[in-house]
């Protein structure tokens, strides 16, 4: 006969299943990178899923194309003749008000689209939602191309196309973040910014190619190409998998497993897929237990939702307040002011720097993490603006503004503009989207992202509309305003933005719910990967058998 006696030494059963804060801090950041669920493979094994993410990210190309082309349109002779105002000397010019409205109103449309059309992703799925918003975008392009000499018709078309792009800006990063492997999520979401920069660059090139014409080819051809981009985007959506989190939400479990397996290049029976699927289901059940999400929930402190919403709004706002669109929207105009003979060529150079630099971002965002990149970017861009503004104010016109500008000073300004764009392209440009795409729990994700990205669009409108007035008033001193915003952004990131590198979306949510201090978040370990360490309060189970 075998008998056993069990004695339990310890005072707290709870302590046996959780770590104390002290024990948690002892764990090393390297442990965080060790995946206990789906093992990492060589990056070449993920080419397929990365290609799919690139297709989804093509929505960013559409936005970039608009940014790159509109900066040239407002300087094209036919565009000014049709939509400008007749001057005393017989020429046509766009007034500051009309220029600001035509450039900036696109962002208002984007904000409206993000807040209203982003909801389609929750109702019909991310893929179908993206197809729907692309259709809205096409309607806006048709209105713009059909405009003949009524600037307000073109204005309305930009609002409608902006609504489509706003929906894309919410749904595209969302879908990428939900289908990409967690250790490549930062890189894959950064594809969206890569496509934006490609669109800006090719938009500049197209403007350069059409400026030699004297009729509506100058601006209607670039607009007509938008139909090709829309068709390519829709075809791409047919090929990509649906979000596994959306599929679980709709009860399509087998499809969700296949989507996870496809993203991680394993079979549906792989233990890692089973573990991640079970985690998604468990989190979904918890969300269902508390009912459907409402707009009011975004302003609740429960689950640290409100601090995350505020953080997303501020990060997206600060991306605009870096001053990036000061160059992208008005680059052609700016370099006319510094004496460049062909400012269209200069814009192409800036677009090329922007596009090439973003490839660096694809590497560093998951190599060095979100916080370090944002901090470095804020500091370097602030330095660039100090030099750009100081040279522009004190050295560009040594004999007065009514005299020729200094070529050497103009060259210095262009060089530091390139340094600024390099710093922006590898840090704030992609990472602002990465942050908002991985910060929110699924039940409020689309609403929270819509508000955050909407803030980006609103600031884009304000900068686009008021820049002509501000530069006319204070000139290149405008750069000091952006420098101040960049200094603020440095301290905001340090005190309020958590490091999410190497975490699943569910683990990111867990970290925020535990209210980890952002400057300590780099060493935080998810509960599923913690190794309990013996303490005086840990129960000790002794089994005697005979």
From Swiss-Prot:
Any transmembrane segments, and where? 45-65, 101-121, 128-148, 159-179, 186-206, 221-241, 325-341, 348-365, 373-393, 416-436, 454-474, 476-496
Q: Membrane side Cytoplasmic: which residues?
A: 1-44, 122-127, 180-185, 242-324, 366-372, 437-453, 497-546
Q: Which residues are glycosylated?
A: 75
The residue ranges for the Extracellular side of the membrane come to: 66-100, 149-158, 207-220, 342-347, 394-415, 475
How the protein sits in the membrane? Multi-pass membrane protein
Question: Where does the record place it?
Answer: Membrane
Organism superkingdom: Eukaryota
Q: Which family does it belong to?
A: Belongs to the major facilitator superfamily. Sugar transporter (TC 2.A.1.1) family.
| Record's protein name | Hexose transporter HXT10
State which gene encodes it.
Answer: HXT10
